[in-house]
Amino acid sequence: MLHISRLGLFLALFAIVMHSVNLIKYTSDPLEAFKTVNRHNWSDEQREHFYDLRNLYTTFCQRNLSLDCFTQILTNVFSWNIRDLQCKSAVNLSPLQNLPRAETKIVLSSTAANKSIVASSFSLFYLLFATLSTYTADPPCVELLPFKILGTQLFDIKLTDESLQMAISKFSNSNLTRSLTPFTPEIFFNYTSFVYFLLYNTTSCIRSNDQYFEHSPKPINVTTSFGRAIVNFHSILTTTPSSTPSSTSASITSPHIPSTNTPTPEPSPVTKNFTELQTDTIKVTPNTPTITAQTTESIKKVVKRSDFPRPMYTPTDIPTLTIRRNATIKTEQNTENPTENPKSPPKPTNFENTTIRIPETFESTTVATNTTQKLESTTFATTIGIEEISDNIYSSPKNSIYLKSKSQQSTTKFTDTEHTTPILKFTTWQDAARTYMSHNTEVQNMTENFIKISLGETMGITPKEPTNPTQLLNVKNQTEYANETHSTEVQTVKTFKEDRFQRTTLKSSSEPPTVQTLSVTPKKKLPSNVTAKTEVQVTNNALPSSNSSHSITKVTEEPKQNRMSASTHGEINHTEIPRMTPILNAHTWEKSTTPQWPFTAETSLTTSSKSAILTWSNLLTTPKEPLTNTSLRSTNHITTQLTTSNRTQSAKLTKAHVSSQTTNIYPQTITERSTDVKKKSSTESREANKTLPGNDYRVTDKNSHNHPDNLTTKAYSTQNATHYTYNERHDLNNTDST
């Protein structure tokens, strides 16, 4: 037995050594080193960015790049250890601005702390493009690559046209460039390291960045993802145009050591990360990634959101999003693909990657479509429909929908191809507008003139009597502001966990108003000649007004128009998730005496199907859990309530009445009331505070320094419904608040 154990241990060690040797062995196949990682193990972020980057490369270079080559190169970059997350800069080059901003520390020396590179992943991708471009000797591609952005991202390098031309000249005449015929992993890493070094030494750099890269005439022992390599930048920069290939190879101190003599490299981050993600549950094809039916538990084993966190931004990174005055917008489906014309570079935009989490399944309200049926009316700011797109887009195991930017002429579409849930398409009408939402429900939107229209805050619903009054959301003192039969009636059948809300950080600016549109089309299609239209009148005054207009959506027949027809796709089955992830946040809290600037908007919802049934699953809803904070300002609020069953995970949308004042169906849907609103007694509030258990959710007016009115929301859950009541603190010198 002892002999067998020793033999087994020896064989195991031998296998490990041989595997390590294979990582850095020299071969005639230049891509062998990049063919060791399986794309099936990627997370949704990796899969998304892979196709984004591949499209970007083909847009710039118009070359047929090997899918395996691109896969393995990007896999290598994605797999490096992430030390920290931060937004390096605000360079706007779509779609690269949607990349996760991560810092990677590349150790250049194990003895000196300053022998290292701290580079953002944003820069590493540009570096890879530069490497691929110059290696393939494609001059147009090299000229088009944004080296200036690369330098800015990496070292705060201020590249001029002269310095850039000199760097490219040195780069093309260097020994390393001419020695790329044996495209080994060591040579590749030396090559990319040389790009960093060359850009750093041929331009004016900020002194504080010297720690990132230091010139050294001595060979540097470099730890790479493929093992260890030796870089001698002094010999690399020695240009010898008349040298022979043998002398060129000799000048590079990454020697061609036989694989049998190569020491065992240290375990690389690549091996570690992909061991954690090892699974066969995700099946991906090169052009149309899909996901097989699997359980939520298995998905969580594949992708952990903490493994690939979304970027975090500071308030200064997010510009304002305001509303255009007197804007008449007609929202239609846009079939334009921004990557159809590879010759035109991507249009820059300030939108960062946006994530909205939705429940797994939607079971929407069905409304017959005829000329007399009234549908939900949308008070404009954001328009929601439901859209199914089956295109070269990416699936999302975590039920995340990434709302990517759309310029005024093109739309970047992202969808969960395997889900039957609604699909979102993000549209902006101003390049300067940007919205960011992260997976941890933190978002920041700043607006001017107290305009606040939340993505889930502006739905006006046709009145509907409740079917079961006992299941309605109980709002304290509801009848006092149920003027003109505008009461809050929301049905719920799910008990939610009491998670803490995250407040929205508001910041004002002086940008002119603009319009943002969030559109989704329904799964069921209307005939192409049937259009649901909504014409609304909305003011930007945050205070409730008695003359606020309420619009009604009409379904009319129109001549057939060329609009997008969503295609069908497969389904994915999930088990019950532990909690319903919120969609959007309705959060209003501001005082304003700004004059009302009316604007109108026409929303067209056009679908096509054999059945004349419109399945309207509206994502402008208010779940009972904290929503992802997105804040704009308006006088109308959410009135559609999303509910879900704890067992079947079916989400139902029920209509509710809404007042033009305040819709207290969500703890953070709080708007300061004008003086003509009936005052809620302090005694009643104190009684409600004593009788209702739950968590405190506070929303503070950060702009009111002299009158800090703090509204405290009490929430508690029962078996069938979640009840909310409100408690407030009044300042006698301030306006009454609800």
From Swiss-Prot:
Processing and modification events after translation: 120 kDa Glycoprotein O: A shorter mature protein, gO-80K, is produced probably by proteolytic cleavage.
**Signal peptide (residue range):** 1-23
List the InterPro entries.
Roseolovirus_U47 (IPR008645)
Q: Name one Pfam family in it.
A: Herpes_U47
Query: Where is this chain compositionally biased, Low complexity type?
Result: 240-263
Q: Where is this region: Disordered?
A: 240-272, 330-351, 541-568, 667-712
List glycan-bearing residues.
Answer: 41, 64, 114, 175, 190, 201, 221, 273, 326, 353, 370, 445, 477, 483, 529, 547, 573, 629, 646, 689, 710, 720, 733
What are the UniProt keywords, alphabetically? Glycoprotein, Host cell membrane, Host membrane, Membrane, Signal, Virion
Residue stretches of biased makeup (Basic and acidic residues): 673-689, 698-708
Q: What's any one GO cellular component for it?
A: virion component
Q: Where is the composition biased (Polar residues)?
A: 330-342, 541-554
State the family it belongs to.
Belongs to the herpesviridae U47 family.
Q: What is this protein called?
A: 130 kDa Glycoprotein O
